[in-house]
Amino acid sequence: MFGTSSSNKTISTESLSQMIYVSEEVEFGTVIFSTKDWIQPSDENDIVRATSFIANVITKALLKSQKIKENKFDVLVYLESFKIKQINYQFVKYLADILKQLFPEKLRKAVIIDPPSVFIHSYEIVKKFMDKPTRAKMSLISTKENRILYDDIMDD
């Protein structure tokens, strides 16, 4: 169904919980996704496990937001030292399809921090095909601007 990647490592729930979690630092339900030690899902079991884990974390973020009468969530993705070659496109497509079904119109903001330059250039092309409301939810920032823009973006 998904093919395989060159990695033979299995993704554990423990390793996922260190990379993907709900922030305790903000009141709004915010998912933190750090790719620092990311192991790309390499087989069907890993893809399903990672997708289920991410959906569970998003559910927790939504529940946290609902405590303050909101029904949306934010995502901060830290792409420090991430390489485009690490992407398993089948996983990304599967994850995106599942999340669109489970959480339609629930994303408030997505902030991508320190994306590789190829990602920035690709996003410049892709965003032309996105509708304006979706584009308004997306932000790409660098580490130099991180602290300044985080509050402005997330607290609008």
Language model feature labels by segment:
Residues 1-105, 109-156:
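SEC14/CRAL-TRIO lipid-binding/transfer domains and related phosphoinositide-recognition modules
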